[in-house]
Amino acid sequence: MHTIREKSKLLARVRRIRGQVEAAERALETEKGCAEVLHLIAAARGAINSLMVEVLEDHIRMHVVDPAKERDNERAQGAEELIDAVRSYLR
């Protein structure tokens, strides 16, 4: 599995996300205002989307085509465009 080389980095991100979700849970339990709860949820969602982008980009580079190593310029450009599209959609 290619994510093993980044395992500690990915796990740290997941743990931060867990902390954000737990903060949202505490805010709901203590009946904080809607704006605060929404802010906490939005932060967790952003963190999850960023994690998704990182894992998808790694997957594309490791299992589909690595634009930096691809000799076929059209495939390399297509891979870069796919990575850019994923980034812009999920951020």
Give the ranges of each region predicted by the language model.
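Solvent-exposed interaction patches of small proteins and small membrane subunits
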Residues: M1-R91
